[in-house]
């Protein structure tokens, strides 16, 4: 990955710092499935790209709390949002969507 490419953790860290928050300030606002705040170590691991968010709900919380576009965070996390996954697309529809996302047709028809 090039040095100028943003990662999920990098985006979270940058947004947190822009708000002037310490790790504990953000960690207290993002809840696990059991409704407890995430740990400082877990957040630190996420910010340093050693761990990924454990659920869609957590990606959404980071987006909402930090004011980051949800789709951008899903992209950085390497995930598709639930509403996209629920579409039950065919192989052809997915291929066409990926071509559009990439900005044009791929060379050759094989998988890359």
Annotated model-derived regions:
Residues 1-21, 25, 71:
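A short, Lys/Arg-rich alpha-helix, primarily the initiator
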Residues 13, 27, 39-40, 44, ...:
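Key DNA-contacting residues within the recognition helix of helix-turn-helix
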Residues 25-32, 62:
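Short alpha-helical "recognition helix" segments of helix-turn-helix
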Residues 31-53, 78:
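Recognition helix of helix-turn-helix/homeodomain-like DNA-binding domains
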Residues 54-56, 60, 64-84:
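Short C-terminal boundary/hinge segments that cap the last helix of small helical domains
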Residues 77-112:
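Interfacial/linker helices and their anchor residues that mediate assembly or domain coupling
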């Amino acid at each position: 990955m090039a040095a100028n490419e943003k990662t999920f953790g990098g985006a979270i860290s940058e947004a947190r710092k822009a708000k002037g928050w310490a790790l504990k300030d953000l960690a207290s606002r993002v809840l696990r499935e059991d409704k407890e705040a995430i740990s400082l170590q877990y957040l630190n691991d996420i910010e340093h790209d050693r761990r990924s968010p454990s659920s869609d709900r957590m990606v959404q919380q980071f987006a909402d709390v930090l004011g980051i576009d949800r789709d951008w965070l899903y992209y950085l996390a390497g995930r598709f949002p639930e509403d996209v996954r629920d579409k039950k697309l065919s192989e052809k529809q997915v291929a066409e969507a990926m071509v559009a996302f990439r900005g044009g047709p791929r060379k050759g028809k094989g998988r890359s």
